[in-house]
Amino acid sequence: MTLLETIGIAAVTLHALLSAIYKSMQAFYARKASGSQPRSKDIDPAALPSVDIIVPCFNEDPAILSACLSSLAGQDYGGKLRIYMVDDGSCNREAILPVHDFYTSDPRFEFLLLSKNVGKRKAQIAAIERSCGDLILNVDSDTSIASDVVTLLVEKMRDSDVGAAMGQLKASNRDKNLLTRLIDMEYWLACNDERAAQARFGAVMCCCGPCAMYRRSALLLLLDQYQTQLYRGKPSDFGEDRHLTILMLSAGFRTEYVPEAIAKTVVPDRMGSYLRQQLRWARSTFRDTLLALPLLPSHNRFLTLDAIHQNIGPLLLAVSSATGITQFILTATVPGWTIIIIASMTMVRCSVAAYRSRQIRFLAFSLHTLINLFMLIPLKGFALLTLSNSDWLSRGSTTDGPAIAESNAASNEAEIVASASPFGGGTSWRFRR
């Protein structure tokens, strides 16, 4: 046995052992907890917290934006609800203004039109400073939420120790092609395996941007840190959802996952868009993992194992894959042990997912292993080597995935040039920050 074979076998075996331990514990903790909270419908509406929904938007497709706003208007929530749609200097503003106009007669809606593109994070903050609700729900402009999402998330936020809660994400364009079907299954696993297990300890590590609720009092404490995130002295403009979640945990708040709160978001339908999205996410994950490390000792040991698996696992898989390919090129011999282990792990994972979800389609998720091995793992390596790069790598297409249409164009000042809120009698107003 050559040194190359030994390294490959050792790496893939260690990866298999790590994954077996981690996935077993994850499946155990991801089980649905018993017990239920009182439904908000059974509570006096006057006692319910007020909720502000914030929707940042940049160059969104009018039909997709209309579906988003329609789902917000249809929320079955007994408490006070306000909806702030922030247009972040869209180039297609003329095309989306008719969508705004359709809701101007609804007193719950207010439209903030930024004169220039400032990026998703600053667009959110513009609305946060304008709003006053007890709870803030962030919804991406390419996302539609079920009618009970606000109610379900508010129920989880009734615990004052909870600083943030997210719903379950699904792909609204799942049936478009094979890639969107795989991404939809990837989302299911990310939510109902990873987030569900983390939520058992009140420490969801990323409350995903398309549908996440925050406690205003907690958010205001963290707003300066959120707004001025730096990495190696440079502004960090993406991964805002993960960063804000880590800030919540650092401040001592719990972060939760509510699987019944369903949000459907547009996912990439082209491989190039998907890889650009994954590159941004990989960079933000690596950056905020460093920020999260000091938190791990104060939480259950499973979360430390989770961090190890998320970061060391891909490294072991990369080593085993690279040595296997090199072995085949140099010696024309097939790395049989590596192939058997990876194939076995894939089938076990997909079979467990099919059983837990009661959906046989998850057996087809084995195809995603090829994408992971030959595209995502090298991409993560590139992300690690280019952590200082904060480019969004987006052309503004709405098919680039959740929230990726927003640009990271830098600007320290934003001007709100108009409001479609009927409270102002249709009069334009301005303010600067």
Curated annotation (Swiss-Prot):
Its main location: membrane. Keywords: Cell membrane, Glycosyltransferase, Membrane, Nodulation, Transferase. Disulfide bonds: none annotated. GO terms for cellular component: plasma membrane. Its EC number is 2.4.1.-. It is found in: Cell membrane. It comes from the Bacteria. GO terms for molecular function: hyaluronan synthase activity. It is a peripheral membrane protein. One of its GO terms (biological process) is hyaluronan biosynthetic process. It is an enzyme of class 2 (transferase). The keyword Phosphoprotein does not apply. Involved in the synthesis of Nod factor, a sulfated N-acyl-beta-1,4-tetrasaccharide of N-acetylglucosamine which initiates a series of events in the host plant species leading eventually to nodulation. Belongs to the NodC/HAS family. This is N-acetylglucosaminyltransferase. It comes from Neorhizobium galegae.
